[in-house]
């Protein structure tokens, strides 16, 4: 979304109804959450097959209901951002998602002078960035990869993190207050203390004064084996046969082994649920589950670790890949 587009967006309506968390999200909790009666262009699409994690869902709902800033930490591919979007989708809550990559600048967030056409003439005019617009509307602002944000951006964001936080536009001599329906979320791979695993190059240590402003910090781990199978089958109903379910179960077993191997330090690359889904899709494309595994995951792994990963595959499917130890010994 450009600065000029943000300036031209109309003011959004406010939450005008309440929904029951138990009936909407299927979790065992008594909570009524504010929501919108109608959808707008900013509301994420609903994924009917999405499976909600109870603790993470409660944390996000508390953020929406009680105006709490919520941070979700977890490994890649666990569905942190998607979880926020799917909660917001069922509340019809407008959601803006910003990835804090190295190219996002302070001017992108706050705004800058831009040339616009007024009465047929070019004039220089200040155009608000996405942050001033978002905090003046009932939106859920999601900062993806929050721990990869540049330090100068962190202090801009810090201004609006408190429940009654205000944003000062120095160039405009304006002070903007938070809309009562504005909500703030973030997703991170670390908890602000830097990356000790070596998996997440580019992440930063986060100022602890800022970490203290996140009211709720929750962790979203990888899914249970049976839950992950259920999700893959819902996304790829082609496999919903006896043979297909066995194949998906074995795929998830391989993923579980990579996660266990990562935890014990045997390998440095983890198979996420997203990768399992891609593997299942590629297996249909190539009609070869072993080739699909190589192209979807194995080729990403360090060469010194491919033997271990190939053994995970062999253990689950009883198929030897060329990288497996037995083939290397035989010189195949």
Predicted regions and their residues:
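Alpha-helical lid/collar subdomain of P-loop NTPases
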Residues: 1-40, 50, 57, 224-225, ...
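AAA+ P-loop NTPase catalytic core and its hallmark functional loops
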Residues: 2-245
